[in-house]
Amino acid sequence: MRFFKLRNFERFAIKEGIPDDALKDVVAQMESGQINANLGGLVYKQRLARQGEGKSGGYRVILFYRQGERVFFAFGFAKANMANISQKDLTILKEQAKVLMQQPEESLGIMLKNGIIIEI
């Protein structure tokens, strides 16, 4: 399994102090069957606790996930700042997930080199 962050998500994670290990824990929870919301098209929404707090008032992360293959952390937000994503945004995210999941390894290498994605 390879773990990636999109550039905008990386900025969000740094700003909020979210460590990479916490992101890997989110995926481990999903692999054990704890999926908060399957939004379709390989797009999932998972809750992520703030440091020292619970999940209910924490963060929501949108990720593109195919079990045993790849995960891309695409978007994150604090629940206090945003209730949910719009249908329009979800449509865009599904298309982005489709494109990223179909990329061959060579293309991922180029994206990594150019800073479009960051590997965890």
PLM segments and residue spans:
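Sequence/structural signature of beta-propeller domains
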Residues: E16-I18, A22, L42-Y44, E95
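Arg/Lys-rich, positively charged N-terminal/basic patches that mediate binding to nucleic acids
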Residues: M1-I18, K113-I120
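Surface-exposed, interaction-prone regions with an acidic/low-complexity signature
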Residues: M1-R2, G52, M101
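Polybasic/polar functional segments that serve as interface/processing modules
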Residues: R7, P19-A28, R50-G52, T91
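Basic/aromatic recognition patch in beta-strand/loop cores that engages polyanionic ligands
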Residues: A37-F77
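A charge-rich, low-complexity, intrinsically flexible signal that marks solvent-exposed coils, linkers
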Residues: S32, L39-G40, I117
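Enriched for short, Lys/Arg-rich terminal
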Residues: F64-I118
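Charged, alpha-helix-enriched surfaces in structured cytosolic catalytic cores
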Residues: F4, I18, G57, E69, ...
